[in-house]
């Protein structure tokens, strides 16, 4: 029973302070702008500086002090030309500030947890590339993978429930419900398939969705650590967090007192691995196909009956790792069977031994990468480089530096690719797009401008890694082939940037 105390104890870091009063503080909205995931709504109105934005916040706080003035009408933006086309501007400002406020209990809890456990701060583990060495070591020994799309059609009230355990301020929770029900039509478009990862969604909804996912993972991983074969009789322990600990404690009391072990078969599966990325997660295991089907329908019931989310079985795909590719963090990864023939001779007999072993490969999905280059106006839909007319007003050195920065950042991130051919194609597109942009600026042909730049211009597009490796190793066929097929993982990459952000 002692091993479950960490799950049964109530976290003493829960905060009971009133958070609602922080909505009347100007610095909260300044934090919302500086710490926001997206660009703040305060600065989306063209022609207004920080001083004008501060005036908006002061007017908002003054209005909130007045009774019955928190309910905003859509006519406010029409009657007042100061706000332009932004309807419900006040409500969006409050939602940004409120997103910062509700994160306070979670931030304090995280700091308290790190101090209590005295966890070492490892910057290497923060790198996005740190997950790939783990996949290389583990996935080659597994057989099946569940590719699951997390359901996002969630009732608005379900998003509030996980917060009730951490936020004890009833006024803040009521205000949150007010935002969700009063402005959901203006913030979420019901006619489209909306995911909570799109750029247009407010930060508050991103926080609510992430808190909901954390709630699901907390319960799911707890049960996964205790059991891999869960019977239907164990479904009684799935309840919302506010009653979760009481139910778990009662469950284990029944478990130990009544010898419930013959009904619930608990054991740990050391080969079960869980990875989540954006709106999907992977559950890989060494189990059989029948056992993975049990996990599939178990997850469907888990989401439908305990999180009230409609989960279709078709959103879960069971695949063999040797026949399946994972689209993960900008890579397409797979564990392929590689055969190697070994010739062995004993006396006069000659034997051919065929050894088959799994090898984890990561390649760059060239089609999706060219699609990103097309959206950023570096090439057309067929991958043919084009010029960027928006850069013709810049100096030549500035244009070259921008293209070099994009090329080196892409090469640095995709250095883990097992095959570099796709990466070289991307470099070619960026290099020729840079030349066409310069030629368009000076009103010359591409051939004439390439002769003017010379071969030194082409050498600038080599990454630092390629330059260093070319100096260390001799230019032999075997070495170049090994560098071409090898992959390198870096432990200094903490974010994925869009091509437009590289500029």
Curated annotation (Swiss-Prot):
Keyword Chloroplast in record: yes
Keyword ATP-binding: no
A GO molecular function held by the record: RNA binding
Keywords per UniProt: Chloroplast, mRNA processing, Plastid, RNA-binding, tRNA processing
Example GO BP: mRNA processing
Coiled coil regions in record: none
Subcellular location(s) of the protein: Plastid, Chloroplast
GO cellular component, one term: chloroplast
Sequence intervals crossing the membrane: none
Membership in a protein family: Belongs to the intron maturase 2 family. MatK subfamily.
Function recorded in the entry: Usually encoded in the trnK tRNA gene intron. Probably assists in splicing its own and other chloroplast group II introns.
Entry protein name: Maturase K
Gene that encodes the chain: matK
